Amino acid sequence: MRSGVIAQKVGMTRVYNDAGEHVPVTVLRMDGCQVVATRTVEKNGYTAVQLGAGQAKVKNTSKAMRGNFAVANVEPKAKVAEFRVSEDQLLEIGTEIKAGHFAAGQLVDVTGTTIGKGFAGAMKRHGFGGLRATHGVSVSHRSHGSTGSRQDPGKVFKNKKMAGHMGQTRVTTQNLEVVSTDEDRGLILIKGAVPGSKGAWIIVRDAVKSAAK
């Protein structure tokens, strides 16, 4: 099990494959993705690498993190994430990971924070059909309707689909295909949509369920 990477979402575009078909892709940019710390079985009880990406001003970095970056002899990073790895995949502190870490055609799992939509109704949030337009329905056309029974069970069950805060949640999209990479510019082109807004930090790992596809 090897390390993933931290990348920044640039936006979406499309490219053409060898058959002349256009493929929608999300462009991710890797900006100075370096190993800033390691975790070992002897010292921590597990093996992992801690990566940092982007650039942060020293004044905006906490004193503890400044110390960590100084020990690793790297510039302060805007985003830090830890990846569990097998013992033979541990990397030296200061090692930079580039876009060539992934190959075209490979499947990856992508993690990001979805765009927040604020408080949303049941129709927008869960795709409910709403109530009828006429025949006695007044004001409640977009409501979710009944939420439970009567005295038995006498409550609304947990996880009932209702109106509420939509988006801004941590989401992992599995088995997305890497269309191509550009190591010189640090770009990874992934087929389809990736959770998060433009400029958001994204975690990209090797797919864990790729054998099933």
From Swiss-Prot:
An individual GO BP term: translation
Gene Ontology molecular functions: rRNA binding; structural constituent of ribosome
Pfam families given in the database record: Ribosomal_L3
Role: One of the primary rRNA binding proteins, it binds directly near the 3'-end of the 23S rRNA, where it nucleates assembly of the 50S subunit.
Family: Belongs to the universal ribosomal protein uL3 family.
NCBIfam families on file: L3_bact (TIGR03625)
PANTHER family documented for this protein: 50S RIBOSOMAL PROTEIN L3, LARGE RIBOSOMAL SUBUNIT PROTEIN UL3C
Name of the molecule in the record: Large ribosomal subunit protein uL3
